[in-house]
């Protein structure tokens, strides 16, 4: 997922407007670097340079080093996106339109960033190896949290299909981001959004029809001439 799903920033209080702590600056720098370069470009030196934090503060705030910082940054991004998804899905528009809007918003965000950034969770997932395997369940848990938000919004669709559709939405948007970034063309996201929206509309229609015509219920007998 991308910044398009993040919630709109609220006006900051005086306390919130104070300079961010070195820990917060490192977390935000890590998020930005992970979105741009994955794990390979989000090393300790890169985070320190991007955040402007004192070098000695890294292990003070994150004794586990790069992996601990990456974990915190991923979870922060995951929560941010989940909040944004929930806000977008809570609107009054039909569900297929809202889901298509998520894809289209992500497409606009990627184009605005000149395809230099995508989803930090997706980028890290593609970089995982034996040394960073501890991040695999972190990424999987974040994907699952986004899927849960989507599934909860699919009112009227039975749970097994609802869950499968939610997983498919995440898979589609992640794959479309990879293709869009490679081709520097956001049409992959726009096209995927239209197809996913059509599938959700079909699922809603079929679920509604199934409720109106439960299995085993005889269809009303059509009248014939002479009856």
PLM regions with names:
Residues 25, 33-72:
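Helix-turn-helix
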């Amino acid at each position: 997922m991308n910044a398009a799903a993040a919630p709109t920033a609220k006006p900051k209080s005086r306390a919130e407007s104070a300079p961010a702590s070195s820990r917060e600056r490192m977390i935000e720098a890590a998020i930005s670097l992970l979105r741009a370069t994955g794990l390979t470009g989000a090393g300790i030196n890169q985070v320190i340079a991007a955040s402007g934090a004192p070098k000695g503060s890294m292990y003070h705030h994150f004794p586990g080093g790069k992996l601990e910082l990456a974990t915190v940054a991923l979870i922060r991004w995951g929560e941010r996106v989940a909040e944004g998804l929930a806000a977008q899905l809570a609107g009054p528009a039909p569900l297929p339109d809202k889901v298509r809007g998520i894809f289209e918003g992500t497409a606009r965000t990627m184009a605005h960033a000149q395809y230099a950034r995508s989803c930090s969770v997706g980028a890290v997932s593609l970089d995982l190896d034996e040394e960073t395997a501890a991040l695999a369940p972190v990424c999987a848990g974040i994907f699952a949290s986004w899927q849960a938000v989507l599934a909860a919004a699919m009112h009227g669709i039975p749970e097994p299909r609802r869950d499968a559709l939610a997983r498919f939405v995440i898979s589609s948007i992640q794959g479309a981001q990879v293709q869009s970034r490679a081709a520097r063309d956001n049409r992959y996201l726009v096209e995927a959004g239209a197809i996913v929206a059509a599938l959700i509309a079909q699922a809603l229609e079929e679920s509604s029809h199934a409720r109106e015509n439960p299995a085993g219920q005889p269809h009303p007998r059509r009248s014939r001439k002479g009856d």
